[in-house]
């Protein structure tokens, strides 16, 4: 984690604080009735705490991504056995496609896929094909400023989006109430 990729310019993370925050996060999820699987730390992949980038969960399937950051691609192989124990229907994004889960936002049965430094059009098109095979839909949203789609926008249910920066006026989100 200390050697992870960062664009925030905040310096090195405080490892002990991050461990406490992670434990609190797991406890909060468990208090909501969720079953949490905690994987052992892997020094080879310092960004592996961000599991959303390596796998996108669908209602009855999972899409294993192909991260745009080369240093993260091995994480997909590491998390696959854990997901295989939970989900039968597994698809993978293939080269030349790249896709990271931070660029994927689910709104009901539709998925918005950000085209970013980490997710390209080939990866987004593959994801849309997989979504359609599962009875879901997807569309692409070009990013100009943010690292990931969800760096600047989050769906908070009931037609509401929490948006920041370039996402406030995106035509793709005009049907939502922007907060």
Question: Which residue ranges define each predicted feature?
Answer:
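The feature marks the mature, well-folded catalytic cores of soluble enzymes
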Residues: 1-179
């Amino acid at each position: 984690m200390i050697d992870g990729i960062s664009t925030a310019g905040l310096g090195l993370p405080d490892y002990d604080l991050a461990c406490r925050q992670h434990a609190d996060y797991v406890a909060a999820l468990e208090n909501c009735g969720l079953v949490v699987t905690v994987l052992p730390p892997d020094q080879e992949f310092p960004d592996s705490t961000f599991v959303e980038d390596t796998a996108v969960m669908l209602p009855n399937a999972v899409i294993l991504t192909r991260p745009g950051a080369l240093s993260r691609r091995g994480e997909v192989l590491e998390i696959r056995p854990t997901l295989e124990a939970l989900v039968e229907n597994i698809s993978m994004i293939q080269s030349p496609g790249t896709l990271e889960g931070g660029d994927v936002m689910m709104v009901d049965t539709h998925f918005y896929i950000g085209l970013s430094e980490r997710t390209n059009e080939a990866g987004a098109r593959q994801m849309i094909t997989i979504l359609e095979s599962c009875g879901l839909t997807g569309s692409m949203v070009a990013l100009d400023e943010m690292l990931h789609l969800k760096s600047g926008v989050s769906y908070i249910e009931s037609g509401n989006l929490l948006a920041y920066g370039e996402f406030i006026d995106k035509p793709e989100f005009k049907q939502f109430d922007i907060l």
